[in-house]
Amino acid sequence: MSEFNLKYFGTDGVRGVANKTLTPELAFRLGRTGGAILTRHANDENKKPVVIVGRDTRISGEMLQQAIIAGFLSVGIDVLRLGVITTPAVAFLVQNLEADAGVQITASHNPAADNGIKFFGNDGFKLSDQLEYEIEQLLDESEDTLPRPSADGLGVVNNYPEGVQKYLEFLQKTIPTDLNGMRIALDGANGATSGLLARLFADLGTDFVTLGTEPNGLNINDGVGSTNPAALAELVKENDVQAGLAFDGDGDRLIAVDENGEIVDGDKIMFITGKFLNEQGRLKHNAVVSTVMSNIGFYKALAENDMTSIKTAVGDRYVMEEMIKSDHNLGGEQSGHIIFRDWATTGDGLLTALQLLYVMKETGKKLSELAAPVHIYPQKLVNITVADKEEIQHDPDVIAKIAEVEAQMAGDGRVLVRPSGTEPLLRVMVEAPTQELVEKYTESIANVVREKSGL
Protein backbone atom coordinates (compact mmCIF):
# COMPACT_ATOMS: atom_id res chain seq x y z
CA MET A 1 0.00 0.00 0.00
CA SER A 2 1.06 3.62 -0.51
CA GLU A 3 3.37 5.30 1.99
CA PHE A 4 2.37 8.67 0.51
CA ASN A 5 -0.70 10.66 1.52
CA LEU A 6 -1.93 11.54 -1.96
CA LYS A 7 -4.44 14.36 -2.44
CA TYR A 8 -5.36 14.09 -6.13
CA PHE A 9 -4.35 10.58 -7.21
CA GLY A 10 -6.40 7.57 -6.19
CA THR A 11 -5.71 3.91 -6.95
CA ASP A 12 -6.46 4.54 -10.63
CA GLY A 13 -5.31 8.05 -11.48
CA VAL A 14 -7.11 11.34 -10.84
CA ARG A 15 -10.91 11.06 -10.87
CA GLY A 16 -13.90 13.27 -10.22
CA VAL A 17 -17.11 14.70 -11.60
CA ALA A 18 -16.15 16.26 -14.91
CA ASN A 19 -16.21 20.07 -14.91
CA LYS A 20 -16.95 20.07 -11.17
CA THR A 21 -14.09 18.44 -9.27
CA LEU A 22 -12.14 17.35 -12.34
CA THR A 23 -12.03 20.65 -14.22
CA PRO A 24 -10.26 21.63 -17.44
CA GLU A 25 -8.14 23.97 -15.32
CA LEU A 26 -6.91 21.02 -13.24
CA ALA A 27 -6.34 18.97 -16.40
CA PHE A 28 -4.22 21.80 -17.85
CA ARG A 29 -2.11 21.93 -14.68
CA LEU A 30 -1.76 18.13 -14.71
CA GLY A 31 -0.47 18.42 -18.26
CA ARG A 32 2.16 20.94 -17.23
CA THR A 33 3.26 19.25 -14.01
CA GLY A 34 2.84 15.63 -15.12
CA GLY A 35 4.54 16.41 -18.40
CA ALA A 36 7.49 18.04 -16.67
CA ILE A 37 7.98 15.12 -14.25
CA LEU A 38 7.50 12.32 -16.79
CA THR A 39 9.72 13.77 -19.51
CA ARG A 40 12.56 15.11 -17.38
CA HIS A 41 14.65 12.05 -18.24
CA ALA A 42 13.91 12.17 -21.98
CA ASN A 43 16.98 10.74 -23.66
CA ASP A 44 17.44 12.92 -26.74
CA GLU A 45 18.23 16.55 -25.94
CA ASN A 46 17.83 17.45 -29.63
CA LYS A 47 14.29 16.12 -29.82
CA LYS A 48 11.19 17.23 -27.94
CA PRO A 49 9.61 14.69 -25.59
CA VAL A 50 6.47 12.96 -26.91
CA VAL A 51 3.32 12.05 -24.96
CA ILE A 52 0.41 10.06 -26.41
CA VAL A 53 -3.15 10.86 -25.35
CA GLY A 54 -6.33 8.78 -25.70
CA ARG A 55 -9.84 8.93 -24.26
CA ASP A 56 -13.05 6.96 -23.86
CA THR A 57 -16.45 8.04 -25.20
CA ARG A 58 -17.65 10.37 -22.40
CA ILE A 59 -19.00 13.74 -23.45
CA SER A 60 -16.42 15.44 -21.21
CA GLY A 61 -13.52 13.54 -22.77
CA GLU A 62 -12.86 16.04 -25.54
CA MET A 63 -12.86 18.98 -23.11
CA LEU A 64 -10.41 17.35 -20.71
CA GLN A 65 -8.27 16.00 -23.55
CA GLN A 66 -7.88 19.47 -25.07
CA ALA A 67 -7.01 20.92 -21.67
CA ILE A 68 -4.32 18.39 -20.75
CA ILE A 69 -2.85 18.56 -24.26
CA ALA A 70 -2.60 22.35 -23.88
CA GLY A 71 -0.67 21.77 -20.67
CA PHE A 72 1.78 19.43 -22.40
CA LEU A 73 2.29 21.80 -25.32
CA SER A 74 2.92 24.72 -22.96
CA VAL A 75 6.02 23.03 -21.49
CA GLY A 76 7.42 22.07 -24.88
CA ILE A 77 6.10 18.50 -25.20
CA ASP A 78 4.84 17.11 -28.51
CA VAL A 79 1.56 15.17 -28.40
CA LEU A 80 0.17 12.32 -30.48
CA ARG A 81 -3.63 12.36 -30.16
CA LEU A 82 -5.09 8.86 -30.50
CA GLY A 83 -8.78 9.72 -30.24
CA VAL A 84 -11.21 7.18 -28.74
CA ILE A 85 -9.20 4.12 -27.74
CA THR A 86 -8.91 1.69 -24.82
CA THR A 87 -6.70 2.23 -21.78
CA PRO A 88 -4.56 -0.89 -22.45
CA ALA A 89 -4.06 0.32 -26.02
CA VAL A 90 -2.49 3.51 -24.65
CA ALA A 91 -0.19 1.44 -22.42
CA PHE A 92 0.81 -0.71 -25.40
CA LEU A 93 1.40 2.23 -27.74
CA VAL A 94 3.60 4.09 -25.25
CA GLN A 95 6.10 1.26 -25.62
CA ASN A 96 5.45 0.52 -29.29
CA LEU A 97 5.97 4.15 -30.33
CA GLU A 98 8.77 4.70 -27.79
CA ALA A 99 6.92 7.69 -26.35
CA ASP A 100 8.00 9.34 -23.11
CA ALA A 101 4.60 8.93 -21.43
CA GLY A 102 0.94 8.20 -22.08
CA VAL A 103 -2.37 9.53 -20.80
CA GLN A 104 -5.89 8.11 -20.96
CA ILE A 105 -8.93 10.28 -20.22
CA THR A 106 -11.42 7.87 -18.63
CA ALA A 107 -13.36 6.96 -15.51
CA SER A 108 -13.47 3.28 -16.49
CA HIS A 109 -16.72 1.64 -15.29
CA ASN A 110 -18.07 4.80 -13.59
CA PRO A 111 -21.15 6.74 -14.84
CA ALA A 112 -20.91 9.25 -17.69
CA ALA A 113 -20.78 12.30 -15.41
CA ASP A 114 -17.45 11.17 -13.98
CA ASN A 115 -14.11 11.27 -15.73
CA GLY A 116 -10.48 10.71 -14.89
CA ILE A 117 -6.88 11.02 -16.01
CA LYS A 118 -4.57 7.99 -16.01
CA PHE A 119 -0.84 8.41 -16.61
CA PHE A 120 1.56 5.78 -17.94
CA GLY A 121 5.35 5.96 -17.85
CA ASN A 122 7.56 5.24 -20.85
CA ASP A 123 7.58 1.56 -19.85
CA GLY A 124 3.79 1.31 -20.28
CA PHE A 125 3.16 0.82 -16.55
CA LYS A 126 0.96 2.95 -14.31
CA LEU A 127 2.91 5.49 -12.29
CA SER A 128 4.50 4.65 -8.96
CA ASP A 129 3.23 6.36 -5.81
CA GLN A 130 6.55 8.23 -5.73
CA LEU A 131 5.99 9.80 -9.17
CA GLU A 132 2.38 10.66 -8.35
CA TYR A 133 3.58 12.33 -5.16
CA GLU A 134 6.13 14.39 -7.10
CA ILE A 135 3.43 15.55 -9.53
CA GLU A 136 1.21 16.54 -6.60
CA GLN A 137 4.03 18.52 -5.00
CA LEU A 138 4.36 20.58 -8.19
CA LEU A 139 0.58 20.96 -8.45
CA ASP A 140 0.36 22.45 -4.97
CA GLU A 141 3.22 24.93 -5.31
CA SER A 142 2.01 28.50 -4.82
CA GLU A 143 3.73 29.65 -8.01
CA ASP A 144 4.13 27.84 -11.35
CA THR A 145 7.85 28.08 -12.13
CA LEU A 146 7.88 25.51 -14.93
CA PRO A 147 9.24 26.58 -18.34
CA ARG A 148 7.05 28.64 -20.68
CA PRO A 149 8.75 28.33 -24.07
CA SER A 150 7.60 30.32 -27.08
CA ALA A 151 7.72 30.01 -30.87
CA ASP A 152 9.42 26.77 -31.90
CA GLY A 153 9.94 25.81 -28.26
CA LEU A 154 6.24 25.02 -27.91
CA GLY A 155 4.98 21.48 -28.37
CA VAL A 156 3.08 20.38 -31.46
CA VAL A 157 0.00 18.11 -31.55
CA ASN A 158 -0.66 15.58 -34.30
CA ASN A 159 -3.49 13.09 -34.72
CA TYR A 160 -2.43 9.43 -34.83
CA PRO A 161 -5.38 7.31 -36.02
CA GLU A 162 -2.98 4.50 -37.00
CA GLY A 163 -2.66 3.66 -33.30
CA VAL A 164 -5.88 1.64 -33.27
CA GLN A 165 -4.74 -0.64 -36.11
CA LYS A 166 -1.33 -1.18 -34.50
CA TYR A 167 -3.06 -2.26 -31.31
CA LEU A 168 -5.50 -4.60 -33.07
CA GLU A 169 -2.64 -6.25 -34.98
CA PHE A 170 -0.81 -6.78 -31.68
CA LEU A 171 -3.87 -8.41 -30.11
CA GLN A 172 -4.27 -10.88 -32.98
CA LYS A 173 -0.66 -12.01 -32.54
CA THR A 174 -1.31 -13.10 -28.93
CA ILE A 175 -3.13 -16.24 -30.09
CA PRO A 176 -1.60 -18.68 -32.61
CA THR A 177 -4.78 -19.31 -34.58
CA ASP A 178 -7.93 -17.68 -35.88
CA LEU A 179 -11.33 -18.16 -34.23
CA ASN A 180 -13.20 -19.22 -37.36
CA GLY A 181 -16.72 -20.44 -36.73
CA MET A 182 -16.99 -19.36 -33.09
CA ARG A 183 -20.32 -17.73 -32.25
CA ILE A 184 -20.16 -14.98 -29.66
CA ALA A 185 -22.03 -11.98 -28.24
CA LEU A 186 -20.16 -8.74 -27.53
CA ASP A 187 -21.01 -5.86 -25.18
CA GLY A 188 -18.94 -2.69 -25.67
CA ALA A 189 -20.47 -0.77 -22.73
CA ASN A 190 -20.96 2.13 -25.19
CA GLY A 191 -17.35 2.83 -24.35
CA ALA A 192 -13.86 2.68 -25.78
CA THR A 193 -14.16 -0.82 -27.28
CA SER A 194 -17.32 0.08 -29.23
CA GLY A 195 -15.52 0.89 -32.46
CA LEU A 196 -12.97 -1.92 -32.13
CA LEU A 197 -15.11 -5.01 -31.59
CA ALA A 198 -16.39 -5.55 -35.13
CA ARG A 199 -12.94 -4.92 -36.64
CA LEU A 200 -11.14 -7.33 -34.30
CA PHE A 201 -13.61 -10.19 -34.18
CA ALA A 202 -14.47 -10.08 -37.89
CA ASP A 203 -10.76 -10.33 -38.72
CA LEU A 204 -10.53 -13.40 -36.47
CA GLY A 205 -13.41 -15.12 -38.26
CA THR A 206 -16.07 -15.16 -35.55
CA ASP A 207 -19.80 -14.80 -36.04
CA PHE A 208 -21.04 -12.21 -33.55
CA VAL A 209 -23.93 -10.11 -32.32
CA THR A 210 -23.38 -6.89 -30.39
CA LEU A 211 -24.90 -4.50 -27.91
CA GLY A 212 -23.51 -1.39 -26.23
CA THR A 213 -21.71 -0.25 -29.38
CA GLU A 214 -23.56 3.02 -30.04
CA PRO A 215 -21.97 5.60 -27.73
CA ASN A 216 -23.50 9.07 -27.57
CA GLY A 217 -21.29 10.57 -24.85
CA LEU A 218 -23.86 9.98 -22.12
CA ASN A 219 -24.69 6.25 -22.27
CA ILE A 220 -21.31 4.75 -21.34
CA ASN A 221 -21.81 1.87 -18.84
CA ASP A 222 -25.54 2.69 -18.71
CA GLY A 223 -27.24 -0.68 -18.26
CA VAL A 224 -24.50 -2.37 -20.29
CA GLY A 225 -20.90 -3.48 -19.90
CA SER A 226 -18.99 -5.59 -17.40
CA THR A 227 -20.79 -4.14 -14.36
CA ASN A 228 -24.23 -4.76 -15.94
CA PRO A 229 -24.01 -8.17 -17.67
CA ALA A 230 -27.72 -9.05 -17.45
CA ALA A 231 -28.52 -7.64 -20.91
CA LEU A 232 -25.65 -9.60 -22.43
CA ALA A 233 -26.84 -12.79 -20.72
CA GLU A 234 -30.23 -12.35 -22.43
CA LEU A 235 -28.54 -11.71 -25.79
CA VAL A 236 -26.51 -14.91 -25.38
CA LYS A 237 -29.59 -17.02 -24.72
CA GLU A 238 -31.65 -15.40 -27.50
CA ASN A 239 -28.96 -15.98 -30.14
CA ASP A 240 -27.67 -19.44 -29.12
CA VAL A 241 -24.02 -18.35 -29.02
CA GLN A 242 -21.07 -20.02 -27.29
CA ALA A 243 -20.09 -17.12 -25.06
CA GLY A 244 -20.80 -13.49 -24.22
CA LEU A 245 -18.02 -10.98 -23.59
CA ALA A 246 -18.72 -7.75 -21.68
CA PHE A 247 -16.14 -4.96 -21.48
CA ASP A 248 -16.11 -1.84 -19.33
CA GLY A 249 -15.99 1.80 -20.39
CA ASP A 250 -12.25 1.95 -21.02
CA GLY A 251 -11.71 -1.66 -22.06
CA ASP A 252 -9.43 -2.87 -19.28
CA ARG A 253 -11.94 -5.37 -17.82
CA LEU A 254 -13.78 -8.44 -19.07
CA ILE A 255 -16.71 -10.29 -17.58
CA ALA A 256 -17.90 -13.28 -19.60
CA VAL A 257 -21.23 -15.10 -19.87
CA ASP A 258 -21.39 -18.82 -20.66
CA GLU A 259 -23.70 -20.43 -23.24
CA ASN A 260 -26.42 -20.78 -20.59
CA GLY A 261 -26.36 -17.10 -19.64
CA GLU A 262 -24.42 -17.68 -16.40
CA ILE A 263 -21.81 -15.12 -15.33
CA VAL A 264 -18.13 -16.08 -15.63
CA ASP A 265 -16.34 -13.49 -13.49
CA GLY A 266 -12.67 -12.59 -13.15
CA ASP A 267 -11.98 -15.42 -10.69
CA LYS A 268 -13.33 -18.01 -13.13
CA ILE A 269 -11.50 -16.45 -16.07
CA MET A 270 -8.21 -16.53 -14.12
CA PHE A 271 -8.81 -20.18 -13.24
CA ILE A 272 -9.65 -21.19 -16.83
CA THR A 273 -6.69 -19.42 -18.42
CA GLY A 274 -4.35 -20.32 -15.54
CA LYS A 275 -5.19 -24.03 -15.77
CA PHE A 276 -4.62 -23.97 -19.54
CA LEU A 277 -1.27 -22.20 -19.19
CA ASN A 278 -0.24 -24.55 -16.39
CA GLU A 279 -1.02 -27.65 -18.45
CA GLN A 280 1.16 -26.20 -21.21
CA GLY A 281 3.99 -25.53 -18.76
CA ARG A 282 3.64 -21.78 -19.31
CA LEU A 283 2.25 -20.63 -15.94
CA LYS A 284 5.19 -19.27 -13.98
CA HIS A 285 5.65 -20.88 -10.56
CA ASN A 286 2.28 -22.67 -11.07
CA ALA A 287 0.66 -19.66 -9.42
CA VAL A 288 -1.87 -16.89 -10.04
CA VAL A 289 -1.71 -13.48 -8.33
CA SER A 290 -5.10 -12.25 -7.07
CA THR A 291 -6.49 -9.82 -4.52
CA VAL A 292 -7.92 -10.64 -1.11
CA MET A 293 -11.41 -10.20 -2.61
CA SER A 294 -11.19 -13.32 -4.78
CA ASN A 295 -13.71 -15.97 -3.75
CA ILE A 296 -12.68 -18.95 -1.63
CA GLY A 297 -14.10 -21.17 -4.37
CA PHE A 298 -11.41 -19.81 -6.68
CA TYR A 299 -8.65 -20.67 -4.21
CA LYS A 300 -10.03 -24.18 -3.69
CA ALA A 301 -10.22 -24.80 -7.45
CA LEU A 302 -6.61 -23.70 -7.89
CA ALA A 303 -5.44 -26.05 -5.14
CA GLU A 304 -7.40 -28.97 -6.60
CA ASN A 305 -5.68 -28.39 -9.95
CA ASP A 306 -2.06 -28.17 -8.77
CA MET A 307 -1.89 -24.38 -8.65
CA THR A 308 -1.37 -21.86 -5.87
CA SER A 309 -2.23 -18.20 -5.37
CA ILE A 310 -0.55 -15.09 -4.05
CA LYS A 311 -2.89 -12.52 -2.46
CA THR A 312 -2.50 -8.73 -2.69
CA ALA A 313 -4.39 -5.64 -1.57
CA VAL A 314 -7.42 -4.64 -3.65
CA GLY A 315 -6.47 -2.87 -6.89
CA ASP A 316 -4.94 -4.06 -10.15
CA ARG A 317 -1.86 -1.89 -9.57
CA TYR A 318 -1.04 -3.98 -6.48
CA VAL A 319 -1.56 -7.17 -8.47
CA MET A 320 0.91 -5.95 -11.08
CA GLU A 321 3.43 -4.85 -8.44
CA GLU A 322 3.40 -8.36 -6.98
CA MET A 323 3.63 -9.96 -10.42
CA ILE A 324 6.78 -7.96 -11.16
CA LYS A 325 8.26 -8.50 -7.70
CA SER A 326 7.80 -12.29 -7.70
CA ASP A 327 8.00 -12.86 -11.48
CA HIS A 328 4.49 -14.16 -12.21
CA ASN A 329 2.75 -13.93 -15.56
CA LEU A 330 -0.96 -14.21 -14.68
CA GLY A 331 -2.93 -12.19 -12.18
CA GLY A 332 -6.07 -10.18 -11.75
CA GLU A 333 -9.23 -9.32 -9.89
CA GLN A 334 -12.70 -10.78 -9.47
CA SER A 335 -14.00 -7.63 -11.21
CA GLY A 336 -12.41 -8.71 -14.50
CA HIS A 337 -9.09 -6.87 -14.53
CA ILE A 338 -6.88 -9.70 -15.83
CA ILE A 339 -3.18 -9.16 -16.50
CA PHE A 340 -1.27 -11.38 -18.91
CA ARG A 341 2.22 -10.11 -18.21
CA ASP A 342 3.76 -12.05 -21.12
CA TRP A 343 2.02 -9.51 -23.37
CA ALA A 344 0.77 -6.53 -21.37
CA THR A 345 1.58 -4.05 -18.61
CA THR A 346 -2.01 -3.59 -17.46
CA GLY A 347 -5.40 -5.32 -17.46
CA ASP A 348 -6.79 -5.68 -20.98
CA GLY A 349 -10.35 -6.83 -21.67
CA LEU A 350 -9.84 -7.56 -25.38
CA LEU A 351 -6.61 -9.47 -24.77
CA THR A 352 -8.33 -11.49 -22.03
CA ALA A 353 -11.27 -12.22 -24.35
CA LEU A 354 -8.95 -13.64 -27.00
CA GLN A 355 -7.16 -15.87 -24.47
CA LEU A 356 -10.48 -17.18 -23.16
CA LEU A 357 -11.84 -17.93 -26.64
CA TYR A 358 -8.56 -19.58 -27.58
CA VAL A 359 -8.84 -21.94 -24.58
CA MET A 360 -12.39 -22.81 -25.64
CA LYS A 361 -11.29 -23.53 -29.21
CA GLU A 362 -8.20 -25.54 -28.26
CA THR A 363 -9.93 -27.69 -25.64
CA GLY A 364 -13.20 -28.06 -27.54
CA LYS A 365 -15.05 -27.47 -24.26
CA LYS A 366 -18.02 -25.26 -23.53
CA LEU A 367 -17.37 -22.24 -21.34
CA SER A 368 -19.66 -23.69 -18.66
CA GLU A 369 -17.51 -26.85 -18.55
CA LEU A 370 -14.29 -24.87 -18.24
CA ALA A 371 -15.70 -22.77 -15.39
CA ALA A 372 -17.39 -25.66 -13.54
CA PRO A 373 -14.50 -26.48 -11.14
CA VAL A 374 -14.87 -23.03 -9.52
CA HIS A 375 -17.77 -23.26 -7.08
CA ILE A 376 -18.39 -19.64 -6.10
CA TYR A 377 -19.38 -19.42 -2.43
CA PRO A 378 -22.16 -17.02 -1.41
CA GLN A 379 -20.63 -13.76 -0.21
CA LYS A 380 -21.79 -10.74 1.79
CA LEU A 381 -20.01 -7.44 2.36
CA VAL A 382 -21.11 -5.02 5.09
CA ASN A 383 -19.68 -1.50 5.48
CA ILE A 384 -19.77 -0.13 9.03
CA THR A 385 -18.99 3.49 9.92
CA VAL A 386 -16.51 3.66 12.81
CA ALA A 387 -14.64 6.39 14.68
CA ASP A 388 -11.20 4.77 14.30
CA LYS A 389 -11.06 1.97 11.73
CA GLU A 390 -7.54 0.81 12.62
CA GLU A 391 -8.33 0.64 16.33
CA ILE A 392 -11.58 -1.26 15.81
CA GLN A 393 -9.95 -3.70 13.38
CA HIS A 394 -7.47 -4.70 16.11
CA ASP A 395 -9.92 -4.60 19.03
CA PRO A 396 -9.58 -7.83 21.12
CA ASP A 397 -13.34 -8.49 21.10
CA VAL A 398 -13.54 -8.10 17.32
CA ILE A 399 -10.54 -10.39 16.85
CA ALA A 400 -12.09 -12.95 19.22
CA LYS A 401 -15.41 -12.94 17.33
CA ILE A 402 -13.62 -13.44 14.00
CA ALA A 403 -11.69 -16.37 15.48
CA GLU A 404 -14.93 -17.87 16.81
CA VAL A 405 -16.60 -17.66 13.39
CA GLU A 406 -13.55 -19.10 11.63
CA ALA A 407 -13.54 -22.03 14.07
CA GLN A 408 -17.19 -22.71 13.25
CA MET A 409 -16.37 -22.64 9.53
CA ALA A 410 -13.66 -25.28 9.99
CA GLY A 411 -11.91 -24.24 6.78
CA ASP A 412 -15.07 -24.19 4.66
CA GLY A 413 -15.49 -20.43 4.40
CA ARG A 414 -13.64 -17.18 4.82
CA VAL A 415 -13.75 -13.95 6.83
CA LEU A 416 -12.09 -10.71 5.72
CA VAL A 417 -12.25 -7.57 7.86
CA ARG A 418 -10.41 -4.58 6.42
CA PRO A 419 -10.53 -0.78 6.62
CA SER A 420 -11.64 1.34 3.67
CA GLY A 421 -8.77 3.18 2.05
CA THR A 422 -10.72 6.43 1.66
CA GLU A 423 -13.65 6.47 4.12
CA PRO A 424 -14.17 5.96 7.90
CA LEU A 425 -15.49 2.45 7.28
CA LEU A 426 -14.62 -1.05 8.36
CA ARG A 427 -15.59 -3.64 5.74
CA VAL A 428 -16.75 -7.06 6.93
CA MET A 429 -16.82 -9.72 4.21
CA VAL A 430 -17.89 -13.33 4.75
CA GLU A 431 -18.03 -16.33 2.40
CA ALA A 432 -19.66 -19.62 3.39
CA PRO A 433 -21.27 -22.66 1.71
CA THR A 434 -24.85 -21.33 2.08
CA GLN A 435 -26.46 -17.88 2.07
CA GLU A 436 -28.01 -18.65 5.47
CA LEU A 437 -24.56 -19.19 7.01
CA VAL A 438 -23.21 -16.09 5.28
CA GLU A 439 -25.97 -13.95 6.82
CA LYS A 440 -25.48 -15.50 10.25
CA TYR A 441 -21.69 -15.10 10.33
CA THR A 442 -21.70 -11.59 8.84
CA GLU A 443 -24.19 -10.23 11.36
CA SER A 444 -22.37 -11.95 14.22
CA ILE A 445 -19.15 -10.08 13.42
CA ALA A 446 -20.83 -6.84 12.31
CA ASN A 447 -22.74 -6.56 15.60
CA VAL A 448 -19.51 -6.64 17.61
CA VAL A 449 -17.93 -4.05 15.30
CA ARG A 450 -20.98 -1.78 15.73
CA GLU A 451 -20.80 -2.11 19.53
CA LYS A 452 -17.15 -1.07 19.43
CA SER A 453 -17.55 1.59 16.74
CA GLY A 454 -17.39 4.55 19.09
CA LEU A 455 -20.41 6.13 17.39
UniProtKB/Swiss-Prot annotation:
Modified residues annotated as Phosphoserine in this record: 108
Keyword line: Isomerase, Magnesium, Metal-binding, Phosphoprotein
Post-translational modification as stated in the protein's UniProt record: Activated by phosphorylation.
Positions annotated as active site in the UniProt record: 108
Co-factor binding comment: Binds 1 Mg(2+) ion per subunit.
Gene Ontology MF terms in the entry: magnesium ion binding; phosphoglucosamine mutase activity; phosphomannomutase activity
Catalytic activity line of the entry: alpha-D-glucosamine 1-phosphate = D-glucosamine 6-phosphate
Keyword Chaperone attached: no
Enzyme Commission code: 5.4.2.10
Family annotation (InterPro entries): A-D-PHexomutase_a/b/a-I (IPR005844), A-D-PHexomutase_a/b/a-I/II/III (IPR016055), A-D-PHexomutase_a/b/a-II (IPR005845), A-D-PHexomutase_a/b/a-III (IPR005846), A-D-PHexomutase_C (IPR005843), A-D-PHexomutase_C_sf (IPR036900), A-D-PHexomutase_CS (IPR016066), Alpha-D-phosphohexomutase_SF (IPR005841)
Highest taxon listed in the record's lineage: Bacteria
Role, per record: Catalyzes the conversion of glucosamine-6-phosphate to glucosamine-1-phosphate.
PANTHER family with a match to the protein in the record: PHOSPHOGLUCOMUTASE (ALPHA-D-GLUCOSE-1,6-BISPHOSPHATE-DEPENDENT), PHOSPHOHEXOSE MUTASE
Similarity comment text for this entry: Belongs to the phosphohexose mutase family.
Protein name, as recorded: Phosphoglucosamine mutase
Source organism per UniProt: Leuconostoc mesenteroides subsp. mesenteroides (strain ATCC 8293 / DSM 20343 / BCRC 11652 / CCM 1803 / JCM 6124 / NCDO 523 / NBRC 100496 / NCIMB 8023 / NCTC 12954 / NRRL B-1118 / 37Y)
Origin organism lineage: Bacteria, Bacillati, Bacillota, Bacilli, Lactobacillales
Gene that produces this protein: glmM
